[in-house]
Amino acid sequence: MRILEGNLIGQDKKFAIVAGRFNEFIVSKLIGGALDAFKRHGVEEENIDLAWVPGAFEIPLIAKKLAKSGKYAGVVCLGTVIRGATSHYDYVCGEVSKGIANVSLDTEVPVIFGIVTTENIEQAIERAGTKAGNKGFDAAMAAIEMANLLENI
């Protein structure tokens, strides 16, 4: 039996980050986590591009454009969606999730879901580098691993 796995060596790879500006004070912490993960695993700063979009809903379009460019081993999508008093949260979360998954499947480039979806702001803060780790860091790690796995197939 042959086991296929990706490693966490990011050297000589280029990655893109797409970040939603809405709730920027949280998203900036996710970006910091992603940059930390990339740096720790050999990705040079000049091999990371960051694209800002207005909010989470706009992320899939730019992720698709970046993935189709052929320049990147992976694209990390970062944003925060916090439940409010209306059903807006449900629509945004559902469409962003589907959009990101479709981009990855359509382009065969790892497009990683790093969108923090929470019931309240406290939960979002916890997932941006406090009690619950940093989901940006986790997303960057997944991008490196998936990029290497695809190379091994």
From Swiss-Prot:
Please list the GO biological process terms of this entry.
Answer: riboflavin biosynthetic process
Top EC class for this record: transferase
- A GO cellular-component term linked to this record: riboflavin synthase complex
Keyword Transferase present in the record's keywords: the answer is yes
Annotated coiled-coil segments of the chain: none
Its annotated pathway reads: Cofactor biosynthesis; riboflavin biosynthesis; riboflavin from 2-hydroxy-3-oxobutyl phosphate and 5-amino-6-(D-ribitylamino)uracil: step 1/2
Active-site residues, as the UniProt record annotates them: 88
List the catalysed reactions. Answer: (2S)-2-hydroxy-3-oxobutyl phosphate + 5-amino-6-(D-ribitylamino)uracil = 6,7-dimethyl-8-(1-D-ribityl)lumazine + phosphate + 2 H2O + H(+)
Any keyword Transferase? yes
Binding positions for 5-amino-6-(D-ribitylamino)uracil per the UniProt entry: 22, 56-58, 80-82, 113
Cross-referenced Pfam families: DMRL_synthase
* SUPFAM superfamilies per record: Lumazine synthase
Name the UniProt key words of this record, in alphabetical order: Riboflavin biosynthesis, Transferase
In UniProt terms, what function does this protein have?
Answer: Catalyzes the formation of 6,7-dimethyl-8-ribityllumazine by condensation of 5-amino-6-(D-ribitylamino)uracil with 3,4-dihydroxy-2-butanone 4-phosphate. This is the penultimate step in the biosynthesis of riboflavin.
Q: What is this protein called?
A: 6,7-dimethyl-8-ribityllumazine synthase
| Species | Clostridium perfringens (strain 13 / Type A)
* Source organism phylogeny: Bacteria, Bacillati, Bacillota, Clostridia, Eubacteriales
The UniProt gene name for this protein comes to ribH
